[in-house]
């Protein structure tokens, strides 16, 4: 039974038992930013189990795409070397949300395994929690499993309820016993039953885990029964397929065998048992599906995990002799295997291929040099009998050549060497500290402040009348007063000034009273809730305790707000036009523009840019209100607010609904979308592999831009004697005319060259039976020079010729040597002789070569020396 059929039978079986088939959720958990990747079937139902979400069904079944390759769930180093470790796997599961419980869950599992999949009953063993008499009795008395094949597992992990057969969601919350089903491969395979000293052998393989959530554990460890207990089960598709296909390694199942054969094809390797092929076959699944779900290779978070997996696959291809990109070629094979079950993979095939190819090409630029350094270091280490690689070297490979630490550790492990990881960590920490020190911004960074928090009024007000000075800083040190002309940082107890945060620049404005005026050039955070006003005291003396009117530059704030609100609309529009993989990677919002970096692997087309602009401007015309609400983080995310992975959020967050956009945001925004006025994209480009940048303008800036563009169009139309609407047609006509004139000019040059050729032939000097000619051909281009040389070679029969032309301060050179003469005089050497004297170089075939130079003043002397140079070689 093939893996695809096993998956299909599982889902159909539970559908027949009243379960709703729920499609696999994304590998990027939408409801849990603390989790790197979806690693089990229950992740998408976590809020249902916690009671904070309700679904229109009480029974569900899924085939969930899962990844374990980061954080605590990290199987990366074992992948390819063991029978059952994978970065990507499919978890088959059935779930009950307060509907059925142990009796039905156990009966369903037994029926599916023994009736649908036809597994022999006498091959199945089960474990239950030591105290779960109910599950034990169901297996023994209702299902009929012999008691000698039912094993009770107690608290075997050193604490109460710490057991292989007791599941917990965390320190508190839903928990309960579980029962596991094992398949016995028979006595010919080493290993003992669960709970025995030999349980780590391969004879008894766990295939299904049924979790019974029946308790809630509080902070004191007290257990209370849940009013509606739930069921969460998980069975690895790959493990089940290995059992049903009578093989002992997951890599021997049909799905993996097909991918291993594809990996062998693209790496040109014949040994299908090579572990590197297993690594590559496993990694293409994880990489492809992560990219499908919007993850792009990068240097942090999920993007870095993806980069590590890609580069590990590339390293194994390199180990097999591949010196160029190969990994991306497996995407089509993966689509053939899994595209029917997961249509999103087929839809994203080209994007996945492009992202992987770009990442490969980038790494292949450095892998050879990096591997050479690593191999040399390992050879030196082995010669000295050492077993630990210097952590500083591992960091150099990481920092300079893009080698993730686990890739270096992988190579070392194959040679029986470990990496000094503490030294690596120290080097990494030093670099981060240097970066942090270099990134300290102006005077507000690193100030020692122990006072009260600043109360921010800037969401509602542009001025605050009774702001009290609570701290002053000059050159990073606290002072009690500031004199006119000094730069300083002012901390107030209340302020309307927005401090730079979330990509939005800080406010500018004025702090003043009757005798004092302080010009604020920038506003930034001294601490999380303490705002510093950086600027210059223009008048008077400013002291701690003074009371000031704090007023922002309202016009600058308004322009900044327009750009910030437009950024939210643009983010949403980009996701609609390009796909849900678009994720913000950085932004800068100021009064002039918005700059937005996002994950996408290809330049935006003109049509895509127009569609984004149209969507945003439609939202502006709708004049929808901006609605701000403060709510618990979990509630905001559950309500669809976009949270950025890697951002730190408090328990309470600010949610902005603006038109069709909903995001978590602490910035300042327009009251209605119509306040943005007009939105125009003015730049699109790439900033890194898989990262694009868009710059856009709004409001009066956008109006001026369009007006200036219109003026330039009118000027161009006038110059071409056409109406603006006819400009494209008129330009096409002019281009046709230019092409026609260029053809005429080329014909004239050819004709001129032909006529000059006759004259030049008469200037040739015979040296040892070879006609030598070195001359300048005025007004000739490279093509004309070549044609003239060819004609002279035909005319002179035995010749060595150099022709030159000068245009725009640059020298063009062509050398031609006839077949007989080229036995002694090479055109490439001849042209280089002249080129070196005019500040250039060149090369070519023995009979024809070309060169260029930048010193035309030296050309006459260089040509004059050709005769002697040829004569010396005859």
Curated annotation (Swiss-Prot):
Chain positions recorded as Zn(2+) binding sites: 564, 568, 665, 669
Cofactor binding note: Binds 1 zinc ion per subunit.
EC number(s) per entry: 6.1.1.7
Locations listed in the record: Cytoplasm
A Pfam family that the UniProt record links to this protein: DHHA1
Family stated for the protein in its record: Belongs to the class-II aminoacyl-tRNA synthetase family.
Name by which UniProt lists this protein: Alanine--tRNA ligase
Annotated organism of origin: Burkholderia multivorans (strain ATCC 17616 / 249)
Gene that this sequence comes from: alaS
